[in-house]
């Protein structure tokens, strides 16, 4: 094992990286309330793992979507547990995100020089809500269908750009297969990719600037 470590150390200087990570200064005022952001990230990882597992069985079709979810819940080994964890973790992620935003705001973590960290966090909040909106409709049951219809119809009230935006979201004049395909693509590819990039940017800025001091 020592030879393997020495091989990597010679090429990547892993010890220097480990020392940099472990020696990062943590202000003495930091307490348990500063863990909300980390919990959000943990929930995101759980969402990725459980969501990926369900993609093996879920079918994004208006005909088969509900039946495939029912199959996951009743026939797939531990499918009920995986989907339940996915739902519970989604709720936990939103709740922890709200608490994280309040904590950052109340402790002044958005002030100079951390404005960009705050901006990326706000965008991440929008992405998180978008996860909920798109995922809610994927079972394509009565609740999911009407939720999708209402959500995609909201932009119609916006002058000029509203109606074209509705067409883009729905993939046509009415809610149907094209809408479900768009929601599935957004939920499983577009939003996770955006979240990963934004989280990396968010973490790098926190790493660079450190945790804000007490008020």
Curated annotation (Swiss-Prot):
Heme c binds at residue 35. Keywords: Chloroplast, Electron transport, Heme, Iron, Membrane, Metal-binding, Photosynthesis, Plastid, Thylakoid, Transmembrane, Transmembrane helix, Transport. It holds the Pfam family Cytochrome_B. Heme b 1 binds at residues 100, 202. One of its GO terms (cellular component) is chloroplast thylakoid membrane. Disulfide bonds: none annotated. Heme 1 (or BH or b566) is high-potential and absorbs at about 566 nm, and heme 2 (or BL or b562) is low-potential and absorbs at about 562 nm. This is Cytochrome b6. It comes from Thalassiosira pseudonana (Marine diatom).
């Amino acid at each position: 094992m020592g030879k393997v470590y020495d091989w990597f150390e010679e090429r990547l200087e892993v010890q220097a990286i480990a020392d940099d990570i472990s020696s990062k200064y943590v202000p003495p005022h930091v307490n348990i309330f500063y863990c909300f952001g980390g919990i959000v990230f943990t929930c995101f990882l759980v969402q990725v793992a459980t969501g990926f597992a369900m993609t093996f069985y879920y079918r994004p079709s208006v005909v088969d979507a509900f039946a495939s979810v029912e199959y996951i819940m009743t026939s797939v080994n531990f499918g009920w547990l995986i989907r339940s964890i996915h739902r519970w973790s989604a709720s936990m992620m939103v709740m922890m995100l709200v608490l994280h935003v309040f904590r950052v705001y109340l402790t002044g973590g958005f002030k100079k020089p951390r404005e960009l960290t705050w901006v990326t966090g706000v965008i991440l909040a929008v992405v998180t809500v978008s996860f909920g909106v798109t995922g809610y409709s994927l079972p394509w049951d009565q609740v999911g269908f009407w939720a999708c219809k209402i959500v995609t119809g909201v932009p119609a009230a916006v002058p000029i750009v509203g109606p074209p935006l509705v067409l883009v979201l729905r993939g046509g004049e009415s809610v149907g297969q094209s809408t479900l395909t768009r929601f599935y693509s957004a939920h499983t590819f577009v939003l996770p990719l955006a979240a990963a990039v934004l989280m990396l940017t968010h973490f790098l800025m926190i790493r660079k600037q450190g945790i804000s001091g007490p008020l």
